[in-house]
């Protein structure tokens, strides 16, 4: 199995994105603490808050990395070898998540 990942940039965020993600994921909890919000989804319902760069970019990066963690747990090909991952790319702020997944940056 060959897998390629594309991480979106700002403008694609909304409160109900990634409904399957575990809300107790440490990356999401750390993000909430950094943004001083008890619930990132509730905060995202405020479109003004959600469109602020300082909020949206942190949310998108943390959510992308949390989704990557969960994907690794559920895709057997990624559990045994990262060689199945043939390409990662990101648009705008998504480039940070792509660089982390590629091993160029640490989360």
Per-range role (PLM):
Residues 1-107:
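FabD-like malonyl-/acyl-CoA
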């Amino acid at each position: 199995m060959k897998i390629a990942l594309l991480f979106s940039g700002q403008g694609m965020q909304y409160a109900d994105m990634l409904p399957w993600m575990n809300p107790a994921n440490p990356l999401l909890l750390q993000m909430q603490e950094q943004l001083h919000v008890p619930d990132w989804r509730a905060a995202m319902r405020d479109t003004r808050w959600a469109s602020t760069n300082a909020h949206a970019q942190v949310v998108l990066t943390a959510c992308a990395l949390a989704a990557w963690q969960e994907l690794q747990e559920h895709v057997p090909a990624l559990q045994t070898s990262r060689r199945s991952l043939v390409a990662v790319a990101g648009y705008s702020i998504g480039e940070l998540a792509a660089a982390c997944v590629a091993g160029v940056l640490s989360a």
